[in-house]
Amino acid sequence: MKISDAKFDIALANSGLTIGQAAERAGISRVRYAAILNQKRVTPQAAGKIAKGVGVTVEQIIETED
């Protein structure tokens, strides 16, 4: 599973939050949040934390395979 940079950026912009604020909402440190975003592949649990931070579903921020 990979988080789409473009989809995440849109979700973050729509939320009006900073990365630090999104990390706080997700219950993890800003450093850990950023590290997850920079990974090539993420676990479903990590994707869930990232999505929770910006208030969207996982489906809204992951890259889909066609």
Regions from the language model: what does each represent?
Residues M1-Q21, E63:
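A short, Lys/Arg-rich alpha-helix, primarily the initiator
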Residues D9, A34-A35, G48, I62:
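Key DNA-contacting residues within the recognition helix of helix-turn-helix
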Residues Q21-A23, I50:
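Short alpha-helical "recognition helix" segments of helix-turn-helix
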Residues G27-V42:
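Recognition helix of helix-turn-helix/homeodomain-like DNA-binding domains
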Residues G55-D66:
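Short C-terminal boundary/hinge segments that cap the last helix of small helical domains
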Residues Q39-K52:
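Short, basic-rich loop-to-helix N-cap that marks the start of a DNA-contacting helix
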